[in-house]
Amino acid sequence: MTTFQDKVKALRAHHEELLSRKNEPIEWGNGIYEKYKNPILTAEHTPLEWRYDFDEKSNPYLMQRIMMNATLNSGAIKWNGKYLLVVRVEGADRKSFFAVAESPNGVDNFRFWDEPITMPEDVVPATNIYDMRLTAHEDGYIYGVFCAERHDDAQPGDLSAATATAAIARTKDLVNWERLPDLKTKSLQRNVVLHPEFVDGKYAFYTRPQDGFIDTGSGGGIGWALVDDITHAEIKEEKIINARHYHTIQEVKNGEGPHPIKTDKGWLHLAHGVRGCASGLRYVLYMYMTSLEDPTKVIAEPGGYLLVPEGPEYIGDVMNVVFANGWIADEDGKVFIYYASSDTRMHVATSTIDRLVDYCMNTPKDDYRTQFSVEKIKALVAKNKQTLSK
């Protein structure tokens, strides 16, 4: 007969096998990056102590008392030689919270810290918080900018009506957080990201103005705004620096992912684009670059997507979605792109600064018409014929 302790032992062995599983790159990629065979984090990776009561008297059937649904949309930072993710963990009750998971190499063996982050509340408590972007700012703090969701009390009869604001917190150890007032804006805001450097002596934010909680409405794309005081941040003026366009991957909406990476050629940006299709909304990742001298000036934008859901990545709570709000650039130029698939699990893809800059600078842009797309393909065919005939 299997005893309670036998079940616990087997459960821990199964969990450890999952946590210690080695990850390997998938062969035959696109040359831009390498995806990896296994997700790096799933709901099953969360600590057993978060889910099980290990007291046989109060839990004789060894049931999960608190179930986890997903691990997704994680901020990322290199910290004390470790690769850290501030993960959005979603419970079975639909409430999201933040928790730190760390890895020695950035691609596998991610393990959560003992407890979730205790995030101080705003003056007006939020129902849900999620999708943190981490920025190690030159002012010495690590900032977390995330979405704070509350019910829209202006529509008391609609239980799905919600508001979205950009919440701001800062820390120096990723354990103790100081909550600052939410970013004051003229419209709802999601996907807000703090630029890592001062610009003209001010804090700079990438924004995404929108009319509704889901729909962007008149919001034109990824915006840019300067703020005098981060402790009472208010956006009075913003301008669109990366716009939406008809019949593109960012037709319906787009948003900045993590903060951009500084290179000697310009700022590398990772963003998500959304278009409508017969099955709903399709989320993909794309890139663009901005000038070092003027971070609002786009200097390169390759046409189409960089990364899309493939194979099992397509299946999950919200189908046909990839989303990224964290990446890490190592000192040797290697880049770790952390992305979630279908609002369910976390993955990693690796590349280099040089490859991503080459991709941005030398991939044809979208000229918004089929004719121009065909002309580019024919020009490449002609070039290859000439090259291969030598």
Where are these regions (language model features)?
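Short, surface-exposed ligand- or partner-binding patches at beta-edge/loop junctions that are enriched
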Residues: F336
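Well-ordered alpha/beta subsegment
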Residues: I328-G333
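Short glycine-rich, acidic/polar surface loops and turns
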Residues: E310-Y314, V322-W327
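Beta-rich carbohydrate-recognition and catalytic domains
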Residues: M1-N73, I77-T127, A136-V193, E197-V252, ...
